[in-house]
Amino acid sequence: MKNTNPNSQPVELNRTSLFLGRLLIFVLGILFSSYIFN
Protein backbone atom coordinates (compact mmCIF):
# COMPACT_ATOMS: atom_id res chain seq x y z
CA MET A 1 0.00 0.00 0.00
CA LYS A 2 1.83 3.08 -1.27
CA ASN A 3 1.26 6.55 0.14
CA THR A 4 0.30 8.73 -2.81
CA ASN A 5 -0.40 11.73 -0.57
CA PRO A 6 1.95 11.43 2.44
CA ASN A 7 1.11 14.90 3.77
CA SER A 8 -2.66 14.67 4.18
CA GLN A 9 -3.31 10.93 4.50
CA PRO A 10 -1.46 10.11 7.80
CA VAL A 11 -2.87 13.22 9.51
CA GLU A 12 -6.40 12.23 8.52
CA LEU A 13 -5.82 8.66 9.74
CA ASN A 14 -4.35 9.94 13.00
CA ARG A 15 -7.29 12.24 13.65
CA THR A 16 -9.80 9.53 12.79
CA SER A 17 -8.09 6.87 14.91
CA LEU A 18 -7.72 9.25 17.87
CA PHE A 19 -11.38 10.27 17.60
CA LEU A 20 -12.56 6.66 17.32
CA GLY A 21 -10.34 5.64 20.23
CA ARG A 22 -11.70 8.36 22.49
CA LEU A 23 -15.27 7.63 21.41
CA LEU A 24 -14.82 3.90 22.03
CA ILE A 25 -13.33 4.47 25.50
CA PHE A 26 -16.10 6.96 26.31
CA VAL A 27 -18.90 4.60 25.24
CA LEU A 28 -17.31 1.61 26.96
CA GLY A 29 -16.90 3.64 30.16
CA ILE A 30 -20.56 4.66 30.12
CA LEU A 31 -21.76 1.12 29.42
CA PHE A 32 -19.46 -0.34 32.09
CA SER A 33 -20.50 2.18 34.76
CA SER A 34 -24.20 1.81 33.96
CA TYR A 35 -23.84 -1.99 34.06
CA ILE A 36 -22.14 -1.87 37.47
CA PHE A 37 -24.47 0.69 39.05
CA ASN A 38 -27.48 -1.14 37.69
From Swiss-Prot:
Keyword Membrane listed: yes
State the source organism's domain of life.
Answer: Bacteria
Q: Spell out where the chain crosses the membrane.
A: 17-37
Key word Transferase present: no
Q: Which InterPro entries match?
A: PSII_PsbL, PSII_PsbL_sf
Look up and give the membrane topology term. Answer: Single-pass membrane protein
Where is the protein found, in the record's own terms?
A: Cellular thylakoid membrane
Coiled-coil stretches: none
What keywords appear on the UniProt entry? Membrane, Photosynthesis, Photosystem II, Reaction center, Thylakoid, Transmembrane, Transmembrane helix
**What GO biological process terms are annotated to this protein in UniProt?**
photosynthesis
**Can you cite an annotated GO cellular component?**
photosystem II reaction center
- State the family it belongs to: Belongs to the PsbL family.
Q: Assembly and partners?
A: PSII is composed of 1 copy each of membrane proteins PsbA, PsbB, PsbC, PsbD, PsbE, PsbF, PsbH, PsbI, PsbJ, PsbK, PsbL, PsbM, PsbT, PsbX, PsbY, PsbZ, Psb30/Ycf12, peripheral proteins PsbO, CyanoQ (PsbQ), PsbU, PsbV and a large number of cofactors. It forms dimeric complexes.
Per its database record, what is this protein's job?
One of the components of the core complex of photosystem II (PSII). PSII is a light-driven water:plastoquinone oxidoreductase that uses light energy to abstract electrons from H(2)O, generating O(2) and a proton gradient subsequently used for ATP formation. It consists of a core antenna complex that captures photons, and an electron transfer chain that converts photonic excitation into a charge separation. This subunit is found at the monomer-monomer interface and is required for correct PSII assembly and/or dimerization.
NCBIfam families noted in UniProt: PRK00753.1 (NF001972)
Name of the protein this chain belongs to: Photosystem II reaction center protein L
User: What is the phylogenetic placement of the source species in the record?
Assistant: Bacteria, Bacillati, Cyanobacteriota, Cyanophyceae, Prochlorotrichales
